[in-house]
Structure formats: structure tokens, C-alpha cells
From Swiss-Prot:
Residues 145-198 are annotated as: Disordered. It comes from Mus musculus. The lineage of its organism: Eukaryota, Metazoa, Chordata, Craniata, Vertebrata. Residues 118-198 are cytoplasmic. Its main location: membrane. Residues 157-170 have a biased composition (Pro residues). Residues 1-24 form the signal peptide. The chain crosses the membrane at residues 97-117. This is Protein shisa-like-1. One of its GO terms (cellular component) is membrane. Glycans are attached at N52, N94. It is found in: Membrane.
Length: 198
């Protein structure tokens, strides 16, 4: 076997021995185990829903016997471990992660509000009025007609809108006026076509 292969095997062996030890350093998690009869038991986090809220630590005599949640005094007696000997103790909180969650949540909320304002400004005229009154306005509030429709069909400023052409073979009829609630006079008239019914 080459020295490179032997070295990688040694690194793998050390890693496989240290990895469970690192995972078991967290005293609030009872890892999965196989008992002396060969039955597999799933891991769990202490306290379980059925446990007292003071039972926050995982107690066991060795890795092949029943694991259960216990309190601090029982943990120190069973595991022969002094939890308060460390500089930060066992119940340290990760405040930097909590701060990160709050900052991330703030940015997500900000993006949601900005998205709502943009959607409202594009679709509702009353929102444009209020945003302009509050000093929030700009080019982004003007909707480009070519943006959503077909650019070949979109009328350019200063050009009249193209009139719909009747299909060949039909007789042109007089246009009818379109009545709307707003009183738009810029709408093109609707064309009626003859249809045959059997």
C-alpha cells in the first residue's frame, strides 16, 4: 500500500473516531444507540414533550444502555462530569446566530414591503398619488407599455393606435361607440361582424 493511501486511511480512521465524540459533546442530545439485545433506539433531544422541563440533559451509564433525560444533579452523579467547570458552562446561548436571524428577518420584511409598494404603485392609481405625496416617486412608477405586451403591437407615443382590420370576405359595418364608466374617449370603437347560425 502506498504512503498516500495509508495516510488517507489514518485520517479517515481519526475522523471516524472523533466525529461521534464531537457530536456527543452536546449534552442535551441523546444520540441513537443499539442496546445489548441489538435493538436500535432513535435519538432525541432533551427535554422531550413527556419530560419535566428541568430534565434538559441526556443521562446514560454507557452507550449500550437506556438513555433518558435527567436534571443537572443526576447528570453530574451518573456521568461523573462537572458541567460548571468550563468557562461558559453548558447552557451557553448562541447570540450571534440569534442576531443573524433578526437581521435576516428585517431584510426579508423590508423586501416584502418594497415589493408591495412597487406592485401597488404599478396597479393602483391611488397608491401612486400617496407615494408621490410622500416623496417616493421616480421613473420606476411609469409603466412602459412595451414591457408587458408585444413590442410590435405597442403604439409609440405620438402615433395613433392601429385600427383592427376585419377579416377578408366580410362586409364592413358602422362602428359602434364604446361606453365605459370612466368616460374614455380614447378607446377604439368595437367592430361587429356578421355571423351565420345553423
Amino acid at each position: 500500500m502506498t504512503s498516500c493511501g495509508q495516510r488517507s486511511r489514518n485520517v479517515l480512521a481519526v475522523f471516524s473516531l472523533l466525529f461521534p465524540a464531537v457530536l456527543s459533546a452536546h449534552f442535551r442530545v441523546c444520540e441513537p444507540y443499539t442496546d445489548h439485545k441489538g435493538r436500535y433506539h432513535f435519538g432525541f433531544h432533551c427535554p422531550r414533550l413527556s419530560d419535566n422541563k428541568t430534565f434538559v440533559l441526556c443521562c446514560h451509564h454507557n452507550n449500550t444502555v437506556f438513555k433518558y433525560c435527567c436534571n443537572e444533579t443526576e447528570f453530574q452523579a451518573v456521568m461523573q462530569a462537572n458541567l460548571t467547570a468550563g468557562p461558559e458552562g453548558y447552557m451557553h446561548n448562541n447570540y450571534t446566530a440569534l442576531l443573524g436571524v433578526w437581521i435576516y428577518g428585517f431584510f426579508v420584511l423590508t423586501l416584502l414591503v418594497l415589493d408591495l409598494l412597487y406592485y401597488s404603485a404599478m396597479n393602483y392609481d391611488i397608491c401612486k398619488v400617496y407615494l408621490t405625496r410622500w416623496g417616493i416617486q421616480g421613473r420606476w412608477m411609469k409603466q412602459d407599455p412595451r414591457r408587458w405586451g408585444n413590442p410590435a403591437r405597442a403604439p409609440r407615443p405620438g402615433q395613433p393606435a392601429p385600427q383592427p382590420q376585419p377579416p377578408p370576405g366580410t362586409l364592413p359595418q358602422a362602428p359602434q361607440a364604446v361606453h365605459t364608466l370612466r368616460g374614455d374617449t380614447h378607446s377604439p370603437p368595437l367592430m361587429t361582424f356578421q355571423s351565420s347560425s345553423a
